[in-house]
Swiss-Prot record:
Domain called Tudor: residue spans: 80-140
Family: Belongs to the SMN family.
GO BP terms, alphabetized: axon arborization; axon development; axon extension; axonogenesis; dendrite development; motor neuron axon guidance; mRNA splicing, via spliceosome; neuromast regeneration
Phosphoserine: residues carrying this PTM: 17, 20
Protein name (Swiss-Prot/TrEMBL): Survival motor neuron protein 1
One Pfam family, short name: SMN_Tudor
Complex formation: Homodimer. Component of an import snRNP complex composed of kpnb1, rnut1, smn1 and znf259. Part of the core SMN complex that contains smn1, gemin2/sip1, ddx20/gemin3, gemin4, gemin5, gemin6, gemin7, gemin8 and strap/unrip. Interacts with ddx20, fbl, nola1, rnut1, syncrip and with several spliceosomal snRNP core Sm proteins, including snrpb, snrpd1, snrpd2, snrpd3, snrpe and ilf3. Interacts with elavl4.
Subcellular localization, as worded in the UniProt entry: Nucleus, Gem; Nucleus, Cajal body; Cytoplasm; Cytoplasmic granule
GO cellular component: Cajal body; cytoplasm; cytoplasmic ribonucleoprotein granule; Gemini of Cajal bodies; neuron projection; nucleoplasm; nucleus; perikaryon
GO molecular function: RNA binding
Alphabetical list of Gene3D superfamilies matching this protein: 2.30.30.140, Periplasmic binding protein-like II (3.40.190.10)
Amino acid sequence: MANGAEDVVFCRGTGQSDDSDIWDDTALIKAYDKAVASFKNALKGEDGATPQENDNPGKKRKNNKKNKSRKRCNAAPDKEWQVGDSCYAFWSEDGNLYTATITSVDQEKGTCVVFYTDYGNEEEQNLSDLLTEPPDMDEDALKTANVKETESSTEESDRSFTPQKSGHAKHKSKSNFPMGPPSWFPSFPPGPPPPPPHFKKMDGRRGEGPGPSFPGWPPMIPLGPPMIPPPPPMSPDFGEDDEALGSMLISWYMSGYHTGYYMGLRQGRKEAAASKKSHRK
């Protein structure tokens, strides 16, 4: 170690390291510049095509106006429109064709008031502008009309289905409810019969239990033991040994209480079984 202390292990910047080409990111920079240049060229191409696209809507609008004028020229001039007739009219705000119904006609002025069926609006139209059928309806207007017809048909079907559905619901509700209390809980037996006239009360010791047991029925199981009487009080002057002794006595007391309660339950069941056998005899 002392002899090689002055030897040079690595010198930064000499380029003699085997992994010196790792820090050469020239290819990465060229790829990035190429991608940015292609993206800019694409943006320039879109900007050059934008004015042409902006010119197209104007031409389309002119074509739409020409088509609308042609449609209006296609209207039948000899038709005598009357109140209640169905027709197609162009709405003044958007210029689209919609289904309408004539509500009033003014033959002197050559105008009428139409009620747009799908939207509920009213507007005054010239009788010459009304159409009996849409000859060359625009795609957007045709889609709108189809959507409205579909919605109206679905609403009618829903209305027609509603009473039937309610009838089925009523039928189901009637069938789901039981006819009487016995069918609510089929797994439980019915209530006990009234006691016979010759039934005698239990003695005082048994009367303190959960309740009388009827003949032919098993004894009723109590819900739980009554309140446990409090343990005897302890003096606060007890030491550690006295505390341990007191804890032991309390545990014996509680154990004896629960043991007596359990034995009492067993004795009560035996007496109930014996009385049941005697009644059968």
